[in-house]
Amino acid sequence: MQKILIGMLRTYQGSCLVNGIECKNRTKNFYENIGVDFEFSTMYEKLTARENLQFFSSLYEKKPRPIDELLEAVGLEQDADKRVADYSKGMKSRLNFIKALLHDPVLLCLDEPTSGLDPANSRMMKNMILEEKAKGKTILLTTHNMQDAAELCDRVAFIVNGKICALDSPHNLIMSKGAATVTYTWVENGEHRASCPLEQISSDERLKNLIAKNRLQSIHSSEPTLNDIFMDVTGRTLL
């Protein structure tokens, strides 16, 4: 899908419009409003980060965003003049991301943007994505990370064998799985476990009796996640 949207795949059935332009009939200015962040680095390894960004910004007619500000935003200002070949995978991912922001596009196509990042940099990346979203930009996120999808997306589509099998907001998809449940354990000639829907907890006589007699060993609640929806829709687990 992303290959069609960014004009890489020109042979397809049906219609696909980006900013009112049919993708197969793209013009010279088609990419002025599209930013693409592939999962794997598309940088020139022998150039520095700064040189790469200067080169790619020169390909657009629009005035680029300040390179130093973008580098600082992803924590690469101290390594701006280091060759990309010497960057770690996470550093390349961050550099790839800000390359997509250089020309301030209205459409961002992001492919696994947090892949290879530690928790701190992953959080930073997601905050930047949310900032771009708050500006009114359209963001197409391709990911197997269901936590990212739940945090970042207004709508989530599960695509199986080229077909959309489910499409809705993260909240609605999760609620379609069912309500949260409460699981509790107690000891009586061995350990026992039972569960009940959260909204029915007040009518669970066994649970009320265990609490009254101070015999409850543990209790916790859980609710469905997008991982559960993924497994239901696709019939397979996430790796």
Locate predicted features.
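Short, low-complexity, polar/charged sequence segments that are solvent-exposed and flexible
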Residues: 37, 56, 128, 162, ...
